[in-house]
Design a protein with these regions (language model features):
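Gly/Pro/Ser/Thr-rich low-complexity, intrinsically disordered segments predominantly at protein N-termini
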Residues: 1-199
Length: 199
């Protein structure tokens, strides 16, 4: 019998992507190191507006370029170094937006391996543990650039992967500044327009 409700899962157990594929729940969930995290049932209006605007701007920038943009829901499987098959994958996340340049990582299920660029938009339902764990798994997997957008603070936090494989946090950007992607020259987002739409 497939699992249809989150209450049917043992919160002390570690689950794999093979388990995840058998679930038929209404709730959206992510696996982080085998632990189940329930996602917000439906993102709020501000979250969706920001997500749509970022998706539009990324789509314009990557038009006719080899990299591809994927908005949530889109499964990103982050296998560990020794992972073999779906049973060996214990992290499956759905970033708000991600950019994948290596098309070998793409299959009918989503992306297997680290996207080049990930954007997460904070929602009131995000726990500190969830955000800390995501930061760590993105770093370990080798995401080259990670943006954390905080709508309530009207700020963007940018993390770049160093040659040593560690994230380096840049100075936080506020609504009167421009966020510039470091791995994609020319990709710039005016935060005033992102956080304070006209019309």
């Amino acid at each position: 019998m497939p699992v249809t409700d989150l209450s049917e899962l043992d919160t002390k157990k570690l689950y794999s992507y093979a388990d995840y594929l058998l679930w038929r729940m209404k709730e959206r969930i992510e696996l982080i190191r085998g632990k189940v995290f329930k996602m917000s049932p439906a993102p709020g209006t501000e979250h969706q507006r920001i997500s749509h605007e970022l998706d539009r701007q990324l789509g314009n920038y990557f038009y006719r370029k080899p990299c591809q943009v994927f908005p949530a829901p889109f499964d990103v499987r982050l296998p560990g170094p020794a992972a073999k098959g779906d049973e060996g994958i214990f992290t499956v996340v759905q970033p708000d937006l991600c950019v994948v340049c290596d098309t070998v990582k793409l299959d009918e299920k989503g992306c297997k391996g680290a996207p080049d660029f990930v954007i997460e938009i904070l929602s009131p339902g995000n726990s500190k543990k969830e955000m800390r764990d995501k930061y760590e798994v993105y770093e370990e997997a080798g995401v080259r650039e990670y943006w954390l957008v905080n709508p309530s603070e009207k700020a963007v936090f940018i993390y770049l992967l160093s040659k040593e494989g560690r994230f380096i946090g840049l100075q936080p950007l506020t609504e009167d500044q421009v966020a510039k992607a470091h791995i994609f020259p020319g990709l710039e987002i005016a935060l005033n327009e992102l956080f304070n739409p006209v019309g």
